[in-house]
């Protein structure tokens, strides 16, 4: 075997192992490298072999360390030896792989077992499957896909150096040469774990050549597939199939649940998720259904009365942590959601969403009884209880019932006498934060609610609503005894 002159410093490197104390593998490797090989170093000199029993004694970190050190040694020695080979040897080595053992080494690595190996005659690049080679040749030679060879397990070329008997193994994608089959196997494993297909234009790496091929269309504007109907060109055949489907109206993908058809699988997946999202978790108390168990568990707390999330300011408890977070903002005054139209801020995003509809005038939820429209579905539900007379929320203190839970909550404070919201200017206390906000406008003079008809401004929205009835002539309140509207 040809010997290569290498100094000890060639192998100097930072410690791989995170331990302060060197492991037995690291010490063994350093012993090999520091044992006086000043004249020459061969592959056998730096190779550390373990018996199966010895290998079983190593932990995971030591095995990875062994792999890293051996890989570096193999790559360093191989690259140096490759450079000093005579030109005649180099040309003969470029013809293919050596020995059937090389194929066994490739099978040891992840991602290469069971495939044919195909190489390009022009650049020598190796591909795992023939279609990858054809795609590569199409890009390189403008459509000619004949300049390539494919090798199976039984057709790997065998070459022996008659003069020295030396056998070198070359893996074409990166040009590395190895004397030992295990060195090639370890090298292939690391190479496969990375992204071996690099774009020559921008340097971006890809795990599969097909991905690189599609990416190259960005730089070259190359359109390999063309739709004959109107001449549109696309970069991949899959895009062409979807393009044809759009113009022909062909919908080949069908969901089994409802029979609806789609042009591609991405469109098919959306309704499947809808079918999977059926509300299958049902509350045994009230029969209401939910999409998942977590929503059902939150709902059950309404029936049990458990409220684990407590406000540190006023002691109010909530069933969900999100409700507590929104409630705390009533104490801190934080309103992170601001309207871009008028600048009004809100403590909750839902409040901002509802407010935005006031600018557009959109009221998508309409009462079937009286035709009145609302901006939110909850407002419509609460309104329908006026017609039905339903009041599901009862006060545990006095038995009074309410249409909404918020009205019951406000009512409960009348029993406790608690007024947690205090004006910092005059010290007046209020039961509700909304009333404190209205009160503060008496100090600031702010009147944010403006009539669109006459321009008159009001501090409270309810007063604006009452004023607007002067212009519209609306009289929503009817006396049942006298049949008079007010």
UniProtKB/Swiss-Prot annotation:
Family annotation (Pfam families): KRAB (PF01352), zf-C2H2 (PF00096)
Keyword Nucleus on entry: yes
DNA-binding is among the record's keywords: yes
Cross-link (Glycyl lysine isopeptide (Lys-Gly) (interchain with G-Cter in SUMO2)): 273, 424
MF terms in GO: DNA-binding transcription factor activity, RNA polymerase II-specific; RNA polymerase II cis-regulatory region sequence-specific DNA binding; zinc ion binding
Subcellular location(s) of the protein: Nucleus
Domain KRAB: 41-112
Zinc finger (C2H2-type): 118-140, 169-191, 197-219, 223-247, 253-275, 281-303, 309-331, 337-359, 365-387, 393-415, 421-443, 449-471
Major site of localization recorded for this protein: nucleus
Cystine pairs: none
Gene Ontology cellular component annotations, sorted alphabetically: nucleus
InterPro entries according to UniProt: KRAB (IPR001909), KRAB_dom_sf (IPR036051), Znf_C2H2_sf (IPR036236), Znf_C2H2_type (IPR013087)
Signal peptide: none
Superkingdom of origin: Eukaryota
GO biological process, one term: regulation of transcription by RNA polymerase II
Annotated function: May be involved in transcriptional regulation.
Annotated family: Belongs to the krueppel C2H2-type zinc-finger protein family.
Protein name: Zinc finger protein 561
Recorded name of the encoding gene: ZNF561
């Amino acid at each position: 075997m040809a010997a290569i002159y290498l100094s000890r410093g060639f192998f100097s490197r930072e410690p791989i192992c995170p331990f302060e104390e060197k492991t037995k593998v690291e010490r063994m490797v350093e012993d090999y490298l520091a044992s006086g090989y000043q004249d020459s170093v061969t592959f056998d000199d730096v190779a550390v072999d373990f018996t199966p029993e010895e290998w079983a004694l190593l932990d995971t970190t030591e095995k990875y360390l062994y792999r890293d050190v051996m890989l570096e040694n193999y790559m360093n020695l191989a690259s140096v030896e490759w450079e000093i080979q005579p030109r005649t040897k180099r040309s003969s080595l470029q013809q293919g792989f050596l020995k059937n053992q090389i194929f066994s080494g490739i099978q040891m690595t992840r991602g290469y077992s069971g495939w044919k190996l195909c190489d390009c005659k022009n650049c020598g690049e190796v591909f795992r499957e023939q279609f990858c080679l054809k795609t590569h040749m199409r890009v390189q030679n403008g459509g000619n896909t004949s300049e390539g060879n494919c090798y199976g397990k039984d057709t790997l070329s065998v070459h022996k150096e008659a003069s020295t008997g030396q056998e070198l193994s070359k893996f074409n994608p990166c040009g590395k040469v190895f004397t030992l089959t295990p060195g090639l196997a370890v090298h292939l494993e690391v190479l496969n774990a990375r992204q071996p297909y690099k774009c020559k234009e921008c340097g971006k790496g890809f795990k599969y050549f097909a991905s690189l091929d599609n990416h190259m269309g960005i730089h070259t504007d190359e359109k390999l597939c063309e739709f004959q109907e109107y001449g549109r060109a696309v970069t991949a055949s899959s895009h062409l199939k979807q393009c044809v489907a759009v113009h022909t109206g062909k919908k080949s993908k069908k969901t089994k649940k409802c029979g609806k058809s789609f042009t591609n699988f991405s469109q098919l997946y959306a309704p499947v998720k809808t079918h999977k999202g059926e509300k299958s978790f049902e509350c045994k108390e009230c029969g209401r259904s939910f999409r998942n168990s977590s929503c059902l568990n939150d709902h059950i707390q309404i029936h049990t009365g458990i409220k684990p999330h407590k406000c540190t300011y006023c002691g109010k408890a909530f069933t969900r942590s999100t409700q507590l977070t929104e409630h705390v903002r009533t104490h801190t005054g934080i309103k992170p959601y601001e309207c871009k139209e008028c600048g009004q801020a809100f403590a909750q995003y839902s409040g901002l969403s509802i407010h935005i509809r006031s600018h557009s005038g959109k009221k998508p939820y309409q009462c079937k009884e009286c035709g009145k429209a609302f901006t939110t579905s909850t407002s419509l539900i609460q309104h329908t209880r006026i017609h039905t007379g339903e009041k599901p929320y009862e006060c545990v203190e006095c038995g009074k019932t309410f249409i909404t839970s918020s009205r019951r909550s406000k009512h409960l404070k009348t029993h406790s006498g608690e007024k947690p919201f205090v004006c910092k200017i005059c010290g007046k206390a209020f039961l509700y934060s909304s009333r404190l906000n209205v009160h503060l406008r008496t100090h600031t003079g702010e009147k944010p609610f403006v009539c669109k008809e006459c321009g008159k401004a009001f501090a409270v929205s309810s007063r604006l609503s009452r004023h607007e009835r002067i212009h519209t002539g609306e009289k929503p309140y009817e006396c049942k005894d006298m049949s008079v509207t007010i």
